[in-house]
A protein has these predicted regions:
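Coiled-coil dimerization/phosphotransfer module
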Residues: 1-178
Length: 178
């Protein structure tokens, strides 16, 4: 019985770890815009590569499943930039227009051969699958001048959660989003 309890405790810890990994706590604490700002700041401190973040204040605009997808894409892209790009600067731009939510992550690094990478790693494939799950478009353009990831998710995929009146410019709204 004691062994079963120990195994159950380990299993519960693993479920907790997985669930925290699936939905980052930082999203609940800060909201998407500030969570992106936070991981960009951490990236800059760690790598000494400046990151410019352009974003609207998305106060209760996007559902958790979209926030998690976008956050994970930024997280994975920054990891790839740190490991491979040799970039001197990074741009992260998030915007919401009438029909599309768009996320752009761009660096000025050394670039890579997309076809060669797709067969080796699962990171980029996982990102594309996350976006396609929301009926979105995931594109990567890379050259010796850098790499640009563009994610477009139709607002129709979260239309029941979308309320354009909740979009505020960061310049007009300095409060933390919740």
């Amino acid at each position: 019985l004691k062994s079963a309890q120990e195994h159950l405790a380990v299993a519960i810890q693993e479920v907790r770890r997985i669930s925290h990994h699936m939905h980052p706590q930082i999203l609940d604490e800060l909201g998407l815009s500030e969570a992106i700002e936070s991981i960009a700041s951490d990236f800059s401190k760690r790598t000494k590569v400046p990151v410019q973040v352009n974003k609207p204040a998305l106060r209760k605009l996007l559902p958790d499943f979209i926030n998690t997808t976008l956050f994970r894409i930024v997280q994975e892209a920054l990891t790839n930039i740190q490991k491979h790009a040799k970039a001197k600067s990074v741009l992260i731009a998030l915007s919401v227009e009438s029909d599309w939510l768009t996320l752009i992550i761009q660096d000025d690094g050394v670039g890579f051969e997309i076809a060669r990478t797709q067969s080796k790693g699962i990171g980029l494939r996982n990102l594309a699958e996350r976006v396609e799950h929301h009926r979105g478009k995931f594109t990567i353009k890379s050259s010796k001048m850098g790499t640009k990831i563009t994610v477009k998710i139709p607002t129709a995929s979260f239309v029941n959660h979308f309320n354009e009146s909740t979009i505020h410019s960061d310049k007009n709204d300095n409060n933390n989003e919740r």
